[in-house]
């Protein structure tokens, strides 16, 4: 019997799975998929601080293996008093479903589950799977999708193609398919000097001067002009701190943080060299630290993006845009495992108070997913 994606969404939303807690969401999905013949593995990874629960479920053992990836964890609700309804009530008003995680991304998971439930499994020449992370939004994401992918490798399980249900749509469901993502790298620059009294600058060395010169040059450096699939890389200064509350003291240190969102014309190493060379031109008294959140990648347009575009056209009548804009997602890990593209609901209210999606959009997304599955396995 086919599943109603709205009812399933309401049930999944009712679990307050604020990252990295689970509160029953993974078990609920596992039990639901088990009823449709999926072999489910609830996988827990973590350390002394946290235990993250994930799910890998598979129907069939053959190739190709079409995998849907998503996450059940959600960001905090903020002030729940400002919500129209209880954030975990899954309330519907005026044909709009409200709740934390509706958009990002519980309803997309439910839409794909519902789409699968409409398929005659006997017609599938291959297998369908779900990779569901319990921590995509928080600080323990390494115990989510990356850990599950390692488990798949260790257990000789192969995914041939992955569709991620992140909210990619802009104005209407299906108008945007993500075929790649920009990389993200954080820099911390520390300039050192000599502390002293502002009245005796010759006895001190103000590191602020060097930092101003460094940041000015970085801000005026054009990293690239973009290319066919990516917008230009951009660098944003996010903080500048001296930790000095006294107005008559020259500080001995200044720290600046910046983030670069970069396209496939760069690597984290090439960007480090650019920033490091700028710092070295200005002063020898600096330290440079980096943290890479994810590398840029692209799944070049081909049969899978064509299938998804065709499914969108059939259901909605619109032509989808292929995009690489926006932030990072777990696709940055999956791309090392298999080809991956992303399609989900509109991202307009993701992470916001009164997060919501029209009921019709969820049904429409379910129809798109179903049509994509049929095309993928050549099912009439």
Swiss-Prot record:
Keywords: Amino-acid biosynthesis, Cobalt, Diaminopimelate biosynthesis, Hydrolase, Lysine biosynthesis, Metal-binding, Zinc. It catalyses: N-succinyl-(2S,6S)-2,6-diaminopimelate + H2O = (2S,6S)-2,6-diaminopimelate + succinate. Binds 2 Zn(2+) or Co(2+) ions per subunit. The keyword 4Fe-4S does not apply. The keyword Flavoprotein does not apply. It is an enzyme of class 3 (hydrolase). Gene3D superfamilies: Zn peptidases. Pfam families: M20_dimer (PF07687), Peptidase_M20 (PF01546). PANTHER family: ACETYLORNITHINE DEACETYLASE, N-ACETYL-L-CITRULLINE DEACETYLASE. Catalyzes the hydrolysis of N-succinyl-L,L-diaminopimelic acid (SDAP), forming succinate and LL-2,6-diaminopimelate (DAP), an intermediate involved in the bacterial biosynthesis of lysine and meso-diaminopimelic acid, an essential component of bacterial cell walls. This is Succinyl-diaminopimelate desuccinylase.
């Amino acid at each position: 019997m086919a599943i109603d994606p709205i009812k399933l969404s309401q049930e999944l939303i009712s679990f307050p799975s604020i990252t990295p807690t689970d509160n029953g969401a993974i078990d609920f999905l596992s039990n639901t998929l088990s009823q449709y013949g999926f072999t489910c593995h609830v996988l827990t990874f973590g350390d002394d601080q946290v235990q993250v629960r994930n799910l890998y479920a598979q129907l069939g053992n053959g190739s190709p293996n079409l995998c849907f990836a998503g996450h059940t964890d959600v960001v905090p609700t903020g002030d729940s008093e400002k919500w129209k309804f209880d954030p975990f009530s899954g309330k519907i008003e005026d044909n709009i479903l409200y709740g934390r995680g509706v958009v990002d991304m519980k309803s997309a998971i439910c839409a794909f589950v519902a789409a699968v439930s409409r398929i005659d499994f006997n017609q599938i020449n291959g297998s369908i799977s779900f990779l569901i992370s319990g921590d995509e939004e928080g600080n323990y994401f390494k115990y989510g999708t990356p850990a599950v992918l390692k488990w798949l490798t260790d257990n000789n399980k192969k995914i041939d193609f992955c569709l991620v249900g992140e909210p990619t749509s802009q104005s209407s469901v299906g108008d945007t398919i993500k075929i790649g993502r920009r990389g993200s790298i954080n820099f911390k620059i520390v300039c050192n000097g000599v502390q002293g009294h502002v009245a005796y600058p010759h006895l001190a060395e103000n590191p602020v001067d060097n930092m101003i010169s460094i940041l000015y040059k970085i801000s005026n450096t054009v990293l690239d002009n973009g290319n066919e699939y990516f917008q230009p890389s951009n660098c944003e200064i996010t903080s500048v701190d001296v930790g000095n509350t006294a107005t008559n003291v020259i500080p001995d240190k200044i720290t600046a943080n910046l983030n670069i969102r970069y396209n496939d014309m760069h690597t984290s190493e090439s960007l480090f060299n650019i920033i490091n060379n700028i710092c070295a031109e200005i002063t020898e008294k600096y330290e440079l630290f980096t943290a890479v959140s994810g590398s840029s990648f692209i799944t070049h347009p081909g049969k899978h993006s064509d299938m998804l575009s065709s499914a969108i056209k059939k259901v909605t009548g619109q032509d989808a845009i292929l995009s690489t804009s926006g932030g990072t997602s777990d696709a940055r890990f999956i791309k090392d495992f298999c080809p991956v593209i992303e399609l989900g609901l509109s991202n307009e209210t993701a992470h916001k108070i009164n997060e919501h999606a029209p009921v019709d959009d969820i049904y429409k997304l379910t129809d798109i997913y179903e049509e994509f599955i049929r095309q993928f396995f050549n099912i009439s």
